[in-house]
């Protein structure tokens, strides 16, 4: 079986518009005759079910949690990118497309990335309409900040709780459609198998997690929005419920993995504290906006960070990548941090960590401004490690 993405061909700027125009449309009065199954109720699944229901389709949404609000999307922190160019710093749909492809080490499927950049502008408007409280500037306009892999400010955020606020917005839209009768919600239900007819997914087999009842659900289309498979790695920030079983069952029915190693690696996780610890805590990528990453220049230097003078510190990302500084793409920052630790310059008891220092940003902007941006993240870090990041540098290490 060959891998066929069914991505449109031709000049990339016109490919999707041409593809959409050539698709067969469904009359609004006929949409209620179609049944769509959505497996998963996080940001992707919940938003898809709500949007499809609002368009007029009959939707059945399934999740194994007690409520869609229990989805792991709540763990996303830093923000969501969109090419709105509010800061007038040269951003555009093509620049977002280019930065995303480059940040993916040129392994991404370019047609899909371009479509993502195209719809990013509308996604922000949809989120605002759903009531997502994005941060705003003093004049009331939506604020932006920078993220890794970009030289423009295009990230819309809600402090360090962007995923939670986006999920609440999608959940409210989903509940509205449930109330209107276009979406039927099936909680505490696990997908056991995918039903494939002539190469197309036409339904699922489910098990009720309360009474064990097994049922078959048939539809005209199936949307799998069940999250990633990061828990196949030992060190992971994913919840234990992110078990990748739906992906595996789709694979057994003939779905192909285009690039199984293409998982998201975060360079800003709290390092392991014990030999048998596998569940890690993610700190937001947005921290790299104001935090400076460094290690001691001398391998094996175990002095407290405050005792290491400035000329004995190596701000290795700023040294190697002056154009991006600490905002290099995640895989580059992760590889660089691991290389420093492997060379013996890692910090902390285990040596698996680098410093993320906010002392300069606090001097420049003031403690109150830093607290406004990252206060909840600093509180979470102190609760887990017992260290105050306003006074001592954070310690971070890459993880899935």
Q: Can you say where each PLM-predicted feature lies in the sequence?
A:
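Extreme N-terminal leader/targeting segments of oxidoreductases
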Residues: 1-36, 54
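Conserved redox-cofactor binding core of oxidoreductases
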Residues: 128-213, 225, 269-280
């Amino acid at each position: 079986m060959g891998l066929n993405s069914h991505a449109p061909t031709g000049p990339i700027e016109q490919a999707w518009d041409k593809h959409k125009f050539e698709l067969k449309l469904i009359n609004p009065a006929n949409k209620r005759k179609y049944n769509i199954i959505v497996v998963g109720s996080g940001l992707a699944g919940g938003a898809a079910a709500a949007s499809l229901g609002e368009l007029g389709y009959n939707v059945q949404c399934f999740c194994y949690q007690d409520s869609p609000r229990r989805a792991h999307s709540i763990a996303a922190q830093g923000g969501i990118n969109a090419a709105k160019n509010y800061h007038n710093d040269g951003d555009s749909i093509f620049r977002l497309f280019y930065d995303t492809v480059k940040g993916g080490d040129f392994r991404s499927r370019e047609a899909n990335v371009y479509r993502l950049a195209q719809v990013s502008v509308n996604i922000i408007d949809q989120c605002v309409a759903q009531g997502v409280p994005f941060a705003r500037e003093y004049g009331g306009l939506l604020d932006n900040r920078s993220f890794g892999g970009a030289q423009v400010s295009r990230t819309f955020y809600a402090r360090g709780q962007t995923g939670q606020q986006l999920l609440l917005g999608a959940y409210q839209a989903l509940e509205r459609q449930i109330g209107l009768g276009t979406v039927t919600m099936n909680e505490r239900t696990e997908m056991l198998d995918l039903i494939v007819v002539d190469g197309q997914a036409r339904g699922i087999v489910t098990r009720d997690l309360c009474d064990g009842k097994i049922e078959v659900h048939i539809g005209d289309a199936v949307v799998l929005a069940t999250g990633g498979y990061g828990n196949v790695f030992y060190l992971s920030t994913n919840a234990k419920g992110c078990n990748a079983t739906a992906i595996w069952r789709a694979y057994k029915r003939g779905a192909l993995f285009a690039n199984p190693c293409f998982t998201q690696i975060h360079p800003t996780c709290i390092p392991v504290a014990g030999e048998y610890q596998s569940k890690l805590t993610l700190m937001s990528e947005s921290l790299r906006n104001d935090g400076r990453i460094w290690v001691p220049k001398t391998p094996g230097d175990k002095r407290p960070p405050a005792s290491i003078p400035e000329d004995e510190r190596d701000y290795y990302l700023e040294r190697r990548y002056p154009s991006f500084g600490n905002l290099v793409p995640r895989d580059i920052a992760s590889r660089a941090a691991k290389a420093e630790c492997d060379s013996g310059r890692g910090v902390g008891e285990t040596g698996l960590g680098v410093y993320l220092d906010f002392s300069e940003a606090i001097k420049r902007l003031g403690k109150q401004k830093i607290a406004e941006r990252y206060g909840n993240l600093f509180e979470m870090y102190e609760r887990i490690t017992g260290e105050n990041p306003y006074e001592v540098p954070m310690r971070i290490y890459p993880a899935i």
